[in-house]
């Protein structure tokens, strides 16, 4: 089956709506569903589904895992936007979760999604073997936890107004931050997609390298867009990282050098695809869209 970005987005949106039904106590499920179903690019579930398809698996088998990863992503956004974290009022052009439901419910909705997501994997992955499901859950807990996106969030908080002059030390911190805060969910998406397709270890390592590189490129692009875009284009408050003295690619390297680094990262992604003979119009489309939006 040939799928494009819009096909994937429609599929994921329909399933996300199906997987989270409003039940008692309604406020928690409404809060969970609010952020999960906000309009978005759905890159992480798309990359899970497309990796599975690209490596010979069935898209249908990967849908629960792909949607679980989007729920995990939504959880990170809810908590990231909280006043005690980044204190953002808007996400994707809409009020952030705590602005709609209050801080207490937002915290609990994030916690709920963190545990709700793996339940989706175990409940709806009937076509996968128990061993495959255990492998997928292990990947989920690894990238979701204290050695994954949480580690990235901690370093992000601690990077505010860093009193470090050494450029190499700053680069090391910046890379660690973005590998864990951003790349880890892309790695989770592609690694689980490969596992569902029953790919061998070499293919899993190849998609891991692609995902890690793409995640860094995505974060550089995000930093660039924060500098050159408007609220209407991004749907969120701009310039907050700079105001708060956070470490970003643009604050460390400047706009033009950041664009050069982005171009190199995207070229490396294409090299990995070519070397492995991976064929994917969707991945090419994603890379080209980033180039277009950032003007490189």
PLM features per residue range, with description:
Residues 1-296:
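All-alpha prenyltransferase/terpene-synthase fold signal
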């Amino acid at each position: 089956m040939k799928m494009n970005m819009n096909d994937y987005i429609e599929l994921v949106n329909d399933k996300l709506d199906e997987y989270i039904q409003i039940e008692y106590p309604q406020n928690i499920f409404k809060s969970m569903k609010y952020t999960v179903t906000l309009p978005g690019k759905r890159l992480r579930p798309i990359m899970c589904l497309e990796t599975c398809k690209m490596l010979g698996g069935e898209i249908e088998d990967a849908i629960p895992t792909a949607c679980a990863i989007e729920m995990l992503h939504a959880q990170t956004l809810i908590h990231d936007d909280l006043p005690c974290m980044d204190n953002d009022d808007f996400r994707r052009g809409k009020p952030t979760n705590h602005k709609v439901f209050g801080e207490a419910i937002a915290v609990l909705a994030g916690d709920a999604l963190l545990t709700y997501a793996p339940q989706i994997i175990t409940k709806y992955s009937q076509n996968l073997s128990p061993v495959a499901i255990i492998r997928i859950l292990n990947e989920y807990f690894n990238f979701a936890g204290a050695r994954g996106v949480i580690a990235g969030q901690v370093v992000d908080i601690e990077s505010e107004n860093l009193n470090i002059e050494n450029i190499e030390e700053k680069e090391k911190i910046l890379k660690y931050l973005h590998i864990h805060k951003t790349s880890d969910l892309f790695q989770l998406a592609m690694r689980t997609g490969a596992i569902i397709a029953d790919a061998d270890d070499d293919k899993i390592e190849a998609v891991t390298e692609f995902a890690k590189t793409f995640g860094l490129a995505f974060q550089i692009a995000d930093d660039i867009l924060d500098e050159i875009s408007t609220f209407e284009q991004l749907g969120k408050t701009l310039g907050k990282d700079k105001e708060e003295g956070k470490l970003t690619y643009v604050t460390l390297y400047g706009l033009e050098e950041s664009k050069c680094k982005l171009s190199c990262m995207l070229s490396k992604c294409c090299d990995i695809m070519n070397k492995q003979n991976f064929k994917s119009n969707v991945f090419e489309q994603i890379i080209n869209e980033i180039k277009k939006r950032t003007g490189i």
